From Swiss-Prot:
Residues 176-228 form the BSD domain. Residues 15-26, 135-146, 264-276, 284-300 have a biased composition (Basic and acidic residues). It comes from the Eukaryota. This is Protein DOS2. Residues 15-45, 131-151, 240-310 are annotated as: Disordered. SUPFAM superfamilies: BSD domain-like. The gene is DOS2. It comes from Saccharomyces cerevisiae (strain ATCC 204508 / S288c) (Baker's yeast).
Amino acid sequence: MEFFYEEQVACIEDDKISNSHTKETGSTENTENNELQSRDDKTNEAFQKLEEEVNKRYEKTTSAFKKLVIEKDDGIEINLPISNETTETAQKYLKKLDENIHSVESLAQSYWSKMKTKNFWSGFSSFDNAAENDSNDKDENSKENEIAVGGNRTEAELRTLSKDKSVYLDNKMDLQLDPFDVDEKTEEICSILQGDKDISKLMNDIVPHKISYKDFWHIYFLQRNKILDKESKRKEILSKKEKETEEKEVEWDDEEEEEDDDKVEAVADNKSKGETKVAVSQEGLKDVSDHVGLANKDESKDDDDDDDWE
Protein backbone atom coordinates (compact mmCIF):
# COMPACT_ATOMS: atom_id res chain seq x y z
CA MET A 1 0.00 0.00 0.00
CA GLU A 2 2.79 2.37 0.88
CA PHE A 3 4.37 1.64 -2.46
CA PHE A 4 1.12 2.45 -4.21
CA TYR A 5 0.78 5.71 -2.33
CA GLU A 6 4.30 6.66 -3.17
CA GLU A 7 3.69 6.05 -6.85
CA GLN A 8 0.53 8.13 -6.73
CA VAL A 9 2.37 10.95 -5.00
CA ALA A 10 5.15 10.74 -7.57
CA CYS A 11 2.61 10.91 -10.39
CA ILE A 12 0.90 13.91 -8.84
CA GLU A 13 4.22 15.69 -8.41
CA ASP A 14 5.16 14.90 -12.00
CA ASP A 15 1.82 16.31 -13.15
CA LYS A 16 2.42 19.46 -11.15
CA ILE A 17 5.90 19.85 -12.59
CA SER A 18 4.63 19.30 -16.14
CA ASN A 19 1.76 21.71 -15.60
CA SER A 20 4.10 24.34 -14.21
CA HIS A 21 6.45 23.84 -17.14
CA THR A 22 3.52 24.09 -19.56
CA LYS A 23 2.38 27.28 -17.88
CA GLU A 24 5.86 28.76 -18.09
CA THR A 25 6.13 27.81 -21.77
CA GLY A 26 2.69 29.29 -22.50
CA SER A 27 3.54 32.47 -20.66
CA THR A 28 6.75 32.90 -22.63
CA GLU A 29 4.89 32.29 -25.87
CA ASN A 30 2.23 34.78 -24.86
CA THR A 31 4.83 37.41 -24.05
CA GLU A 32 6.54 36.81 -27.38
CA ASN A 33 3.21 37.04 -29.20
CA ASN A 34 2.39 40.24 -27.36
CA GLU A 35 5.73 41.74 -28.31
CA LEU A 36 5.23 40.79 -31.95
CA GLN A 37 1.70 42.21 -31.92
CA SER A 38 2.92 45.48 -30.43
CA ARG A 39 5.64 45.69 -33.06
CA ASP A 40 3.09 45.02 -35.80
CA ASP A 41 0.83 47.70 -34.39
CA LYS A 42 3.67 50.22 -34.32
CA THR A 43 4.63 49.30 -37.89
CA ASN A 44 1.05 49.72 -39.05
CA GLU A 45 0.82 53.09 -37.32
CA ALA A 46 4.04 54.24 -38.97
CA PHE A 47 2.82 53.14 -42.41
CA GLN A 48 -0.54 54.78 -41.81
CA LYS A 49 1.12 58.07 -40.85
CA LEU A 50 3.35 57.86 -43.91
CA GLU A 51 0.34 57.26 -46.18
CA GLU A 52 -1.51 60.19 -44.64
CA GLU A 53 1.49 62.48 -45.14
CA VAL A 54 1.89 61.34 -48.75
CA ASN A 55 -1.81 61.95 -49.40
CA LYS A 56 -1.57 65.45 -47.93
CA ARG A 57 1.45 66.30 -50.07
CA TYR A 58 -0.24 64.87 -53.13
CA GLU A 59 -3.38 66.93 -52.55
CA LYS A 60 -1.36 70.13 -52.09
CA THR A 61 0.65 69.45 -55.24
CA THR A 62 -2.50 68.64 -57.21
CA SER A 63 -4.27 71.82 -56.10
CA ALA A 64 -1.22 73.95 -56.94
CA PHE A 65 -0.87 72.25 -60.31
CA LYS A 66 -4.55 72.81 -61.09
CA LYS A 67 -4.10 76.52 -60.45
CA LEU A 68 -1.14 76.68 -62.83
CA VAL A 69 -2.49 74.38 -65.55
CA ILE A 70 -6.05 74.71 -66.87
CA GLU A 71 -7.41 72.03 -69.18
CA LYS A 72 -9.60 73.26 -72.03
CA ASP A 73 -11.21 71.77 -75.10
CA ASP A 74 -8.54 73.11 -77.45
CA GLY A 75 -5.56 72.31 -75.22
CA ILE A 76 -3.86 73.20 -71.95
CA GLU A 77 -3.39 76.75 -70.66
CA ILE A 78 -0.54 77.46 -68.22
CA ASN A 79 -1.00 80.35 -65.78
CA LEU A 80 2.26 81.32 -64.12
CA PRO A 81 2.18 83.85 -61.25
CA ILE A 82 3.79 87.04 -62.62
CA SER A 83 3.96 90.38 -60.83
CA ASN A 84 2.44 93.55 -62.27
CA GLU A 85 5.85 95.19 -62.63
CA THR A 86 7.11 92.32 -64.72
CA THR A 87 3.99 92.46 -66.89
CA GLU A 88 4.30 96.22 -67.46
CA THR A 89 7.98 95.91 -68.34
CA ALA A 90 7.24 93.11 -70.77
CA GLN A 91 4.47 95.21 -72.36
CA LYS A 92 6.88 98.12 -72.86
CA TYR A 93 9.46 95.94 -74.56
CA LEU A 94 6.79 94.30 -76.69
CA LYS A 95 5.53 97.71 -77.83
CA LYS A 96 9.05 98.78 -78.75
CA LEU A 97 9.56 95.53 -80.61
CA ASP A 98 6.28 96.03 -82.50
CA GLU A 99 7.31 99.57 -83.46
CA ASN A 100 10.67 98.38 -84.76
CA ILE A 101 9.05 95.56 -86.70
CA HIS A 102 6.51 97.97 -88.20
CA SER A 103 9.23 100.40 -89.29
CA VAL A 104 11.19 97.58 -90.92
CA GLU A 105 8.05 96.32 -92.66
CA SER A 106 7.22 99.80 -93.97
CA LEU A 107 10.77 100.29 -95.28
CA ALA A 108 10.78 96.90 -96.95
CA GLN A 109 7.36 97.52 -98.46
CA SER A 110 8.34 100.96 -99.76
CA TYR A 111 11.56 99.54 -101.27
CA TRP A 112 9.69 96.71 -102.96
CA SER A 113 6.98 99.01 -104.27
CA LYS A 114 9.66 101.30 -105.67
CA MET A 115 11.47 98.43 -107.40
CA LYS A 116 8.31 96.98 -108.92
CA THR A 117 6.97 100.24 -110.44
CA LYS A 118 7.19 100.45 -114.24
CA ASN A 119 8.38 104.05 -114.27
CA PHE A 120 11.42 103.34 -112.08
CA TRP A 121 13.70 101.89 -114.80
CA SER A 122 12.25 103.92 -117.67
CA GLY A 123 13.29 107.09 -115.82
CA PHE A 124 16.89 106.72 -117.05
CA SER A 125 15.92 107.69 -120.64
CA SER A 126 16.00 111.46 -120.07
CA PHE A 127 16.38 113.98 -117.27
CA ASP A 128 12.80 115.22 -117.48
CA ASN A 129 11.34 111.72 -117.41
CA ALA A 130 13.63 110.78 -114.52
CA ALA A 131 12.48 113.72 -112.42
CA GLU A 132 8.84 113.03 -113.20
CA ASN A 133 9.10 109.30 -112.46
CA ASP A 134 11.00 110.00 -109.25
CA SER A 135 8.20 112.26 -108.04
CA ASN A 136 5.60 109.67 -109.04
CA ASP A 137 7.49 106.94 -107.20
CA LYS A 138 7.71 109.10 -104.10
CA ASP A 139 3.98 109.76 -104.22
CA GLU A 140 3.19 106.07 -104.66
CA ASN A 141 5.61 105.06 -101.91
CA SER A 142 4.20 107.65 -99.55
CA LYS A 143 0.68 106.38 -100.22
CA GLU A 144 1.66 102.76 -99.67
CA ASN A 145 3.61 103.69 -96.55
CA GLU A 146 0.60 105.56 -95.21
CA ILE A 147 -1.61 102.54 -95.88
CA ALA A 148 0.87 100.17 -94.22
CA VAL A 149 1.39 102.43 -91.21
CA GLY A 150 -2.36 102.94 -90.87
CA GLY A 151 -3.02 99.20 -90.93
CA ASN A 152 -0.23 98.46 -88.47
CA ARG A 153 -1.42 101.22 -86.17
CA THR A 154 -4.95 99.84 -86.19
CA GLU A 155 -3.73 96.32 -85.44
CA ALA A 156 -1.57 97.61 -82.57
CA GLU A 157 -4.50 99.53 -81.08
CA LEU A 158 -6.72 96.46 -81.31
CA ARG A 159 -4.04 94.37 -79.62
CA THR A 160 -3.96 96.77 -76.68
CA LEU A 161 -7.63 95.99 -76.07
CA SER A 162 -6.68 92.33 -75.64
CA LYS A 163 -3.59 92.80 -73.47
CA ASP A 164 -3.61 96.12 -71.61
CA LYS A 165 -5.82 96.06 -68.52
CA SER A 166 -5.36 99.80 -67.97
CA VAL A 167 -7.76 100.37 -70.89
CA TYR A 168 -10.53 98.96 -68.70
CA LEU A 169 -9.39 99.88 -65.20
CA ASP A 170 -8.43 103.50 -66.10
CA ASN A 171 -11.46 104.16 -68.27
CA LYS A 172 -12.56 107.82 -68.45
CA MET A 173 -15.58 107.42 -70.72
CA ASP A 174 -19.07 107.88 -69.33
CA LEU A 175 -20.66 104.50 -69.95
CA GLN A 176 -24.12 105.73 -69.01
CA LEU A 177 -24.32 107.93 -72.11
CA ASP A 178 -24.25 104.90 -74.39
CA PRO A 179 -26.81 102.17 -73.51
CA PHE A 180 -25.39 98.68 -73.74
CA ASP A 181 -27.09 95.27 -73.51
CA VAL A 182 -24.49 92.59 -72.87
CA ASP A 183 -26.99 89.77 -73.44
CA GLU A 184 -27.41 90.78 -77.08
CA LYS A 185 -23.65 90.47 -77.58
CA THR A 186 -23.36 86.98 -76.09
CA GLU A 187 -22.71 85.16 -79.38
CA GLU A 188 -20.21 87.77 -80.55
CA ILE A 189 -18.44 87.69 -77.18
CA CYS A 190 -18.16 83.90 -77.37
CA SER A 191 -16.61 84.08 -80.84
CA ILE A 192 -14.17 86.77 -79.67
CA LEU A 193 -13.09 84.71 -76.67
CA GLN A 194 -12.60 81.61 -78.82
CA GLY A 195 -10.49 83.47 -81.37
CA ASP A 196 -8.46 85.66 -78.98
CA LYS A 197 -6.85 83.91 -76.00
CA ASP A 198 -5.24 87.13 -74.75
CA ILE A 199 -8.52 88.87 -74.06
CA SER A 200 -9.86 85.69 -72.45
CA LYS A 201 -6.92 85.67 -70.03
CA LEU A 202 -7.26 89.41 -69.39
CA MET A 203 -10.97 89.06 -68.62
CA ASN A 204 -10.32 86.20 -66.19
CA ASP A 205 -7.69 88.31 -64.40
CA ILE A 206 -9.80 91.42 -63.76
CA VAL A 207 -13.44 90.26 -63.96
CA PRO A 208 -15.35 90.41 -61.63
CA HIS A 209 -13.17 91.46 -58.65
CA LYS A 210 -11.83 94.64 -60.37
CA ILE A 211 -14.49 95.42 -62.98
CA SER A 212 -17.89 94.00 -63.79
CA TYR A 213 -18.51 91.74 -66.76
CA LYS A 214 -20.90 94.24 -68.37
CA ASP A 215 -18.58 97.24 -68.02
CA PHE A 216 -15.64 95.23 -69.36
CA TRP A 217 -17.38 94.39 -72.63
CA HIS A 218 -19.03 97.81 -72.85
CA ILE A 219 -15.59 99.45 -72.82
CA TYR A 220 -14.24 96.89 -75.29
CA PHE A 221 -16.91 97.53 -77.93
CA LEU A 222 -16.74 101.32 -77.50
CA GLN A 223 -12.96 101.37 -77.94
CA ARG A 224 -13.07 98.96 -80.86
CA ASN A 225 -15.69 101.04 -82.67
CA LYS A 226 -13.55 104.16 -82.21
CA ILE A 227 -10.49 102.43 -83.66
CA LEU A 228 -12.42 101.10 -86.65
CA ASP A 229 -14.00 104.52 -87.29
CA LYS A 230 -10.55 106.11 -87.37
CA GLU A 231 -9.36 103.48 -89.83
CA SER A 232 -12.34 104.06 -92.14
CA LYS A 233 -11.68 107.83 -92.08
CA ARG A 234 -8.03 107.21 -92.97
CA LYS A 235 -9.08 105.06 -95.92
CA GLU A 236 -11.48 107.75 -97.15
CA ILE A 237 -8.74 110.38 -97.01
CA LEU A 238 -6.31 108.11 -98.84
CA SER A 239 -8.88 107.32 -101.53
CA LYS A 240 -9.48 111.05 -102.07
CA LYS A 241 -5.74 111.64 -102.38
CA GLU A 242 -5.45 108.81 -104.88
CA LYS A 243 -8.23 110.29 -107.03
CA GLU A 244 -6.60 113.73 -106.96
CA THR A 245 -3.20 112.34 -107.95
CA GLU A 246 -4.77 110.30 -110.78
CA GLU A 247 -6.52 113.42 -112.12
CA LYS A 248 -3.26 115.38 -111.95
CA GLU A 249 -1.41 112.61 -113.76
CA VAL A 250 -4.03 112.63 -116.54
CA GLU A 251 -3.68 116.41 -116.90
CA TRP A 252 0.11 116.14 -117.02
CA ASP A 253 -0.08 113.43 -119.68
CA ASP A 254 -2.34 115.65 -121.84
CA GLU A 255 0.05 118.58 -121.49
CA GLU A 256 3.02 116.40 -122.42
CA GLU A 257 1.22 115.14 -125.53
CA GLU A 258 0.47 118.73 -126.59
CA GLU A 259 4.10 119.72 -126.04
CA ASP A 260 5.28 116.72 -128.07
CA ASP A 261 2.93 117.67 -130.94
CA ASP A 262 4.24 121.26 -130.90
CA LYS A 263 7.82 119.99 -130.99
CA VAL A 264 7.05 117.74 -133.97
CA GLU A 265 5.44 120.61 -135.91
CA ALA A 266 8.38 122.91 -135.15
CA VAL A 267 10.87 120.29 -136.37
CA ALA A 268 8.84 119.79 -139.56
CA ASP A 269 8.80 123.56 -140.24
CA ASN A 270 12.54 123.84 -139.69
CA LYS A 271 13.14 120.92 -142.03
CA SER A 272 11.06 122.46 -144.82
CA LYS A 273 12.87 125.77 -144.38
CA GLY A 274 16.26 124.08 -144.63
CA GLU A 275 15.32 122.33 -147.88
CA THR A 276 14.23 125.65 -149.43
CA LYS A 277 17.51 127.28 -148.51
CA VAL A 278 19.47 124.44 -150.07
CA ALA A 279 17.44 124.69 -153.29
CA VAL A 280 18.12 128.43 -153.57
CA SER A 281 21.77 127.97 -152.94
CA GLN A 282 22.02 125.33 -155.68
CA GLU A 283 20.32 127.68 -158.24
CA GLY A 284 22.67 130.46 -157.25
CA LEU A 285 25.67 128.21 -157.74
CA LYS A 286 24.40 127.24 -161.21
CA ASP A 287 24.04 130.90 -162.25
CA VAL A 288 27.50 131.67 -160.96
CA SER A 289 28.95 128.73 -162.86
CA ASP A 290 27.22 129.91 -166.06
CA HIS A 291 28.61 133.41 -165.64
CA VAL A 292 32.08 132.04 -164.99
CA GLY A 293 31.88 129.91 -168.15
CA LEU A 294 30.87 132.90 -170.30
CA ALA A 295 33.65 134.98 -168.83
CA ASN A 296 36.20 132.29 -169.64
CA LYS A 297 34.95 132.14 -173.23
CA ASP A 298 35.30 135.91 -173.63
CA GLU A 299 38.84 135.83 -172.27
CA SER A 300 39.80 133.04 -174.68
CA LYS A 301 38.40 135.08 -177.61
CA ASP A 302 40.40 138.13 -176.57
CA ASP A 303 43.56 136.07 -176.42
CA ASP A 304 42.95 134.75 -179.94
CA ASP A 305 42.40 138.27 -181.26
CA ASP A 306 45.67 139.42 -179.72
CA ASP A 307 47.51 136.57 -181.35
CA ASP A 308 45.99 137.39 -184.71
CA TRP A 309 46.96 141.05 -184.35
CA GLU A 310 50.54 140.16 -183.65
